[in-house]
Amino acid sequence: MALKRRDFLLFLGASVGTVAAGCFPSTGKKSSMPFTNTASDTKAVESGLSFQPVRGPLPLATDGLELTKQVKDFNEYEVKDDLVLPEGFAYDVIAAWGDKVGDSRFGYNNDYLSFVETGKDEGLLTVNFEYISSKPWLQTYEQVIGKSLPFAEIDKALKPVGKSGIDAFNLPDNNPTKANIREVSKEALIDLGMGVISIRREADGKWVRTNSQADRRITGISGLEDGRYLKATGPAVAVFRKKGKGYDDKLGDRIIGTFSNCAGGTTPWGTVFSGEENFQSYVPEQVNPDGTPLPPTKRLFVKDEEEIGGLGNVFGLAGNKYGWMVEVDPANPNDYGTKHTWLGRYRHEAVGIRVEAGKRLAFYSGCDRRSGHIYKFVSKGTVKNPKDKANSRLLQNGMLYAAKFNPDGTGRWIALKADTPVNPDLPSIHAGGIINLPKRPEGGIFKAEKDEQAIAFKKQFKTLGDLYTGNPQEKQGAILIDAHLAANAAGATCTARPEDTEIAPDGSLFITFTSGTPSSSDGGPDLRIFQGQDGKAYEYGWIVRLVEDGNNPAAMSFRWKKLALGGEPAEGGAGFANPDNLLIDKAGNVWMVNDMSSDKLNAAIPQGRLDKEGKPMSQSELRGVFGNNAIWFIPTSGPNAGNAYMFGYGPMECETTGPFFTADEQTLFLAVQHPGELHGLRKGGASGYEDRKISLRTPDGQEFLQTRRVPIGSNWPNKTANAPPKPAVVAIRRSDAQPITTAKLS
């Protein structure tokens, strides 16, 4: 048994010997493994995998090849511009960018998926639309949507100012540049937000759309022209309504749209939560001490092949109304979303929802930024019936906490409220050597780069209430609006880009941290907690298991374990980098997708792995070895427990996101996001490919040079020459109509 596999099983809390022998409790109760529900659930997978793993570009210990043959067998490799699945599996495209949805269209860069069943073989699929990939969107918009936009005119207007952008908000209404920017921004924001589509499974196993009354879009401009405003609850509403120091959009607590919708979660009562993540790309993130937003001029409109940003500028969107968790009831065609402000405003990724009768409601979420925190909301009231839609009202009163991880494996929750002491961690303990704090009295960010600055800040401000202004309700609202900086000031632990937060059947929380390297703007994680074997920043990511004391969702302290699964097999890794979304099947197995940056996918790596200056390449630069972003399966029982197997990989330059099983586990819904993000539409002929030399290592450390044939750009999902790449949602199924998770290899 490899050390990495042993570490994984111990991380789950199971005896390695017990798992290897296949000896599980026969009582029908939960076993010691937190993902496992019952002995009968595990029985189906004890004898083997349910699929033949896809062969990726990197030799793995699980390939079944002798090490001496791996160099020969992996000397050449061709990447496919397709969603590649095991033999015996198929996928059907359910919806793609530009398809009609209600009175709008299917948006761009689909992410989180949620399927709420409404009857046998039918239900409502809720889809997030996160952001615009500039190059393919600009290149193919007219081809896909069927109309042109004034891109050339905007480029001409941008030429004198370059990347600094245009303040369209303050241009006269009759200015043609303002009109052009408004038109493009409107179309881009229509492609963001959320969508609900009704679907049905046919007798042959394929899923088709049924176009019910529930089908609708909630876009980035909902409410602007159609009156479909989003609502809000909680303390920040008092800030939205006040006449304060900052910019006023004159809408009170009404909110125009939702965007940057990344991952999310689904409640037992049938509603869906969507996290607004990188909203700072479109509106100002920073706020004043009273929680009111900075003016739209702080986030200008920009457009080039790398970014279309500042989309909220021309419409005067208020920045403090974005960065929230949005709840939608997909079955209610008149529900266009509610932002629950007690859950905090930050760059939300996913949400882990813990609902138990007789206990308080707990929501866990991570801020997906370098130095972001883990948060927990605990309701004031208790749950009576987990399936009662009235549980949504429990989100209107409670408290938001941020996690403090201690190096000894313990931790505590810090309340983000006015009387919480100011006690920031020092810049010197963080990767990157900085920590951002609330700037006072001006508002915005103060970057502390020296320990003395953080110490002086603590002496100047005693409590969070000293940093924010207003009456008690407004002050609490301002703290929630400025949650990231407030958590920094209170001493919450800066982490390593937290992604998914998943609740296991035993109540423990699993968190994926996708990258431990810092940035110049946000800094990085606490190196006492998040470090590689050399004590330095670690790129490939971790999974953390957090257990509340007393297994109580309202506990104020916890225990935690961390496991570095990512990396090359030669270095003890499982063969992937940057873990992202997790999914747990009924048998307790772990399904995972990863999120490597598009510019790192299949990147060339020279023999010897030295950069142009003759220095060893960084972990980030070495990510080309892993190929495309992929879907991984990690069994937690049976003879293969703890090993990682590739279930599939996505088309070129994409990320696979939002995995979600139907209740019978015969279908895996998956979102394919941003195919062709780096190079756009793939051209036909020889120009559509490159042969790249990539230095690989066998699991025992032998270096060799692979010739990898790499398609440049994408034509997925049509897969015909010069077809536009389109984000799309697919349904994956076995050709024999058996469950994906438990059927055995024949």
Regions from the PLM with identified roles:
Residues 11-746:
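Conserved small-residue
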Residues 1-7, 14:
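N-terminal secretory signal peptides
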